[in-house]
C-alpha cells in the first residue's frame, strides 16, 4: 500500500514539474517573440531615420529664381547658372535669365569677379566688427576683474596646462556641424579649382603628373584620391627588406595584381585624355572670333559651360587638398613681388648635396638649361638618383616663373581677379579646417595619454597627434556617414605611433621591426603571466611564426643603449664610462714588460762592438724613428759597401744567438 502511495505521489510530482516546464517554455517563447518584434520595430525605425528625406526637385526656372533671390551681392556668376542647368541654356532660358536680372537688379559676371565682390563685402564686415568691438571696450572702460583673472591664468608656467586650459574653452561639434564644415571646405576648394581652370598653364601643370601616376611614383601618392594607395601599402614597402621568404608570392596573386595594375593604368590614361580634350575645347571656344550677331550672354554662358566641363574632368581625377595647395603655392610664389621665387629656389637647393666645387659647377650648368631638359637628360647629368625629383621640381619652378613673367597669358585685370578668387577659396576652406581641427583637440590629448612613457614627452605626442588630425581634416569625406572623430582617431594614432618609432629610440628601428618586437613582447608577457617565468626562445619563435635566429636578432635589437654618463654608485661620484676598457691604451703590465724588454735588449747590444751595434739598431728599427733600413741605406750612412753591411749583420746575429744572451730574451717572445 505504501509503495502504491509513493508511486502516485511521484507521478503527481512529475506531472506538476512537466506542467511547470511547459509553462516556462511558453513564457520564454513569448518573451523571445516580443524581443524579436521589438528588434524588428527598432530596425524599421532606424532604416526610416536613415532614409533621406524626399526633397522636391526644383525646376530650372524655380532654381534660377532662388539663385537670384538669395545672391549675397548685386551680382550672379555665369558658373552658378551653368551648375543649375548642367548645359548651355536654351533661348527661352536665356530670356528668363534676362528677366530675372531686371527684376532683382542683378549683374551677370564671371566667378572670379563674383569672388572679388564677395571679398570686398567681407572686408567691410570685418572692419565694422572690429570697430564695434573697440567701441564696446571704450564704453565699458577698464575691467579690473578681467585683469585679475588674466593674472591668475598666467601664473601657471606649465605649457601643457596652459594649452589644456585654452583647449577646454572650445566647444565640441555635432554631426550636423561637422557635415556643414566639411561642405565649407569643399566649397572653398571648389572656388580654388574654378580659378585654376581659368589658367591653362596650371592645367598643364596637373597634366605633367600623368607619367608619375602611371609609374606609381611616391611623390604623387597623396595628390590624387582616386589613385592613392592605402597607408598599409606603405608599410608593406618597408617590409620588403625584412625577409626573402616574404618575396615569394603565389602566381595567381601576381596575375590579380597585374590585372588590377593594368586597369589602374587604363583609368589614369582615360582620365587625363578626357582632361586634355576638355581643355582643348575650352581654349577653342575662348579663342574663337567674336561674332557681333551672337548674343554676348550666350557666348559667356557657353564659355562658362566649357570651363565647367573642364572642372568636372579635373574632379574625375579627385585632386586632394595637398595638390590644390601645391598649385596655389606655385602660382603665388612666382607672382610674389620680391624674393618669393628666390626663397623657394633656396629651399629646393637645400635638399641637394652640393658639398664640393664639382657638384656646384654641375648644378649651375643644369640650372642654366633646365627648362629645355627632359627627365632623361637630368638623369644623365646628376650623380645620384635621389636628386632627380628635386631637379624636376626646380624645372617646374623655373617654367612657372617664365609663365608668370608673361602673366600666364592672361590680362593683368583678369589675373588679379583669379588671385582674388583663390584668396576667397582659401579663406573659406582654411576657416572651416581650423574650426574642425580646434574642436577635436581634446580627442588628440585623450589618445596621446595612452602613448605616454614610450620615449617621447607628452607635448611632443600632442603635436604629432595634431599633425595626424590635420591630415584627417584634409581627407575626411562626410558622404560616407561616419563621424569625424571616428575617422580622425585612426590618423591620430598612426601619426603618434609613427613618431614614437622614428624619434623615441637613440638608434632608429624600422616600423616593420617594431611590429615584430611588439608581437614577441606580447607572447613573452603572456607566458610570464601564465607560468611565472620567461619562456624559451624556441617556444616564442614557434608562437610568433619566425625562425629562432630571427627571434634572437630581434631581441638583440630591442636592447637600449646605455649612456657613458650614467652615474654609478650611491654617491654619484662615478660614471659608467670610467669603467669601460679603452682598447687603444696599452695596459700597465704590457707597458712594464716592454720597458723591461728595451732595457734587456740594450744590455745585450752592449756586448757588441760599436759598428755591429749600429748595424743591428738600423736594420731592425731600434732607433728613435723605429724604421727598418735596407743594407744599401746602412752602407751609405757607414760609408761601407752593401756586402760589408751584410757580413757585419750576420756576425752580430751569430753572437746574439749564443745561449748566453738568447736565454735572457727568450722569456719576452710573447710580447
From Swiss-Prot:
Keywords per UniProt = Cytoplasm, DNA-binding, Sigma factor, Transcription, Transcription regulation
- Give the record's GO CC terms: cytoplasm
User: CDD domains from the entry?
Assistant: Sigma70_r4 (cd06171)
| Alphabetized Gene3D superfamilies for the sequence | RNA Polymerase Primary Sigma Factor, Winged helix-like DNA-binding domain superfamily/Winged helix DNA-binding domain
Q: Which GO terms describe its molecular function?
A: DNA binding; sigma factor activity
Q: Where is this region: Sigma-70 factor domain-2?
A: 436-506
Q: Where is this region: Sigma-70 factor domain-3?
A: 515-591
Q: Which PROSITE patterns match?
A: SIGMA70_1, SIGMA70_2
| TM regions (residue ranges) | none
* Localization in the cell: Cytoplasm
DNA-binding region(s): which residue ranges? 631-650
Q: Where is this motif: Interaction with polymerase core subunit RpoC?
A: 460-463
Top-level division of the source organism's lineage: Bacteria
- Stretches of Basic and acidic residues bias are at 251-260
Question: Where's it mainly located?
Answer: cytoplasm
What ranges does the record give for the region Sigma-70 factor domain-4, renumbered to this chain? 604-658
Function, as annotated = Sigma factors are initiation factors that promote the attachment of RNA polymerase to specific initiation sites and are then released. This sigma factor is the primary sigma factor during exponential growth.
Outline the subunit composition.
Answer: Interacts transiently with the RNA polymerase catalytic core.
Q: Which HAMAP family match?
A: Sigma70_RpoD_SigA (MF_00963)
* Membership in a protein family: Belongs to the sigma-70 factor family. RpoD/SigA subfamily.
- Name the record gives this protein: RNA polymerase sigma factor RpoD
What species is this protein from? Answer: Helicobacter pylori (strain ATCC 700392 / 26695) (Campylobacter pylori)
UniProt lists the gene as rpoD
